[in-house]
Amino acid sequence: HTLDAAGAVGTVEHVALVTGLKYYLGPFEAYGRNPARPPFREGQTRLAYRNFYYDQEDILAALADKYGFRWSVHRPHTVIGYALGNAMNMGVTLAVYGAIARETGRPFVFPGSPQQYDGTTDITDARLLARSLAWAATSPSATNEAFNAVNGDTFSWRDMWEVVAAGLGVEPAPYPGYPTPLVEQMTDAAPTWRRIAEREGLTEPDVDRLASWWHTDGDLGRPMETYADMTKSREAGFPDVQDSRRSFLDLFDRLRAERVIPEVKVR
C-alpha cells in the first residue's frame, strides 16, 4: 500500500481523500432506495450497503493513527472542470452534446429525470475543490475531518439548462417530462463528431475521449434531489463559494479557446 510505504518513512504530514456524494446515495443501483434525504450532512449515518468510500475512509484513518499523519476527506458532487479523457465528465459531455445538436439539428433536450429537472441540486467546480484541498491541508480546524465540497449555491436543471444552452450557442428544447438518455440519443455521435472535428480543426476527433454519456445519464437521471450542506466547512473556516452558472460558462469558454469544441456565436 502506498501509504504504508510512505508512512513508514515518516515524511507524510497530511493526506487528502476525495470521494463524493455516493457516500450518502450509495451505489448506482441503490439510487432512490435508501433513506438519505438532502441536504446531505457529513455526520449522517452510513447506509447499509457495501461502499468503497467507507472502506477508503476507514483505511485512511487507521493508517493515520499508525503513522501519525493528518488527513481530510472531501465529498464533492459532480465535478465541473477542464479534464479531457476523463470517464466521468459532465461539463465536457454537455459541451459535445450541444455541438452535435447544433450540427445535426436535433433538439438539445435535458436528458434526465423529472426529479432532477424540477428539483434542487448542486455541483462542484474543480477550482473550488482544489481550494478546499489546500485549505484543509494547512488549517488546524480541518484536521482529521470529512467535509462536503460543493459550490454553495443550488439550482434546478430547468433553469440551468437554459444557461448551458446559451453558453453553447444552441436553443434549449422543451423538456418532454421523462428521461431521454444520451446513450440512446448519441449512438451516431462518433462519425458526426469526427466530421465536426476535422472541419473545425479541433484537437480531439474521438468523441469517446471527450464524452461520457453513461455517466451524465446517471447523474441527470437520478430519481431524487441531490445536494449537500456546507455548514461544517463554513464553521471550520472555509468561506469560498462559486456561482454554478460560471462553472459551466467558464469551462465552455476554455474548451473553445483550447480548440476542443467549435467556436460559436454565444447567445
Regions picked out by a protein language model, each given a short descriptive name:
Residues H1-F52:
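Conserved Rossmann-fold NAD(P)-dependent oxidoreductase catalytic core, especially the SDR/UDP-sugar
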Residues T2-E13, Q56-R70, A236:
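A structural motif corresponding to the C-terminal end of an alpha-helix
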Residues V79, A95-R127, N148:
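A conserved pocket-lining segment of Rossmann-fold NAD(P)-dependent short-chain dehydrogenase/reductase
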